Design a protein with these regions (language model features):
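Soluble cytosolic regulatory domains appended to membrane proteins
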Residues: 3-143
Length: 143
C-alpha cells in the first residue's frame, strides 16, 4: 500500500480537481486551517474540563442510566465510582440500548455490565495532539 502525504489524503478525501465549486474550496480551506491550528497544541487544550463531563455513576441502575443517556446529546458516557475522578470505563449508548432490551438487566447497576463497559485511556495533559491523534487512529479509539 502506497503511503500518501497529508496533503494527498486531504486532496483525495475532498476529491480536489479543477472543477471544485466554492463550497468545496471553503471546506478544504477550513480543514487545512484546523490542521494547522492544532498542530502545536497539547491534549489539555482540547480536553473536556472535568466539571463539564457528562458521566454516569457506576451504582445507577441501567434503567436510570439509559433514561439519562437518552436526554443527552452524546453517544459515549464515562462511568465513574464514587466521584468523577474515578473513571472505570465508558459505555456506548448503542450498547446500553442493547442491554436495556433485556428486562432482567434493567435493575442492575451499570458497573455489573462489565462486558459492555469499555476501557478508557488516560492521556497526559502534555501529550501533543499530533501524537494523540495518531495513537487514537492506530487504536481506532474515538473517546
Amino acid at each position: 500500500m502506497e503511503k500518501k502525504s497529508l496533503f494527498q489524503r486531504i486532496r483525495q478525501s475532498l476529491k480536489l480537481d479543477d472543477e471544485m465549486d466554492e463550497a468545496q474550496i471553503r471546506k478544504a480551506a477550513g480543514l487545512i486551517r484546523n490542521i494547522f491550528r492544532y498542530m502545536d497544541k497539547d491534549a489539555k487544550d482540547i480536553m473536556t474540563h472535568r466539571k463539564n463531563i457528562v458521566a454516569i455513576d457506576a451504582t445507577e441502575t441501567l434503567e436510570d442510566a439509559f433514561q439519562f443517556m437518552l436526554g443527552e446529546s452524546y453517544s459515549r458516557f464515562p462511568i465513574y465510582e464514587e466521584d468523577i475522578d474515578q473513571i472505570i470505563g465508558f459505555i456506548h449508548l448503542r450498547e446500553a440500548a442493547t442491554c436495556y432490551l433485556d428486562e432482567s438487566l434493567r435493575k442492575r447497576p451499570v458497573k455489573e455490565l462489565d462486558t459492555y463497559i469499555r476501557s478508557v485511556s488516560f492521556i497526559p495533559e502534555t501529550k501533543s495532539i499530533d501524537k494523540l491523534f495518531k495513537e487514537m487512529q492506530a487504536k481506532k479509539n474515538h473517546i
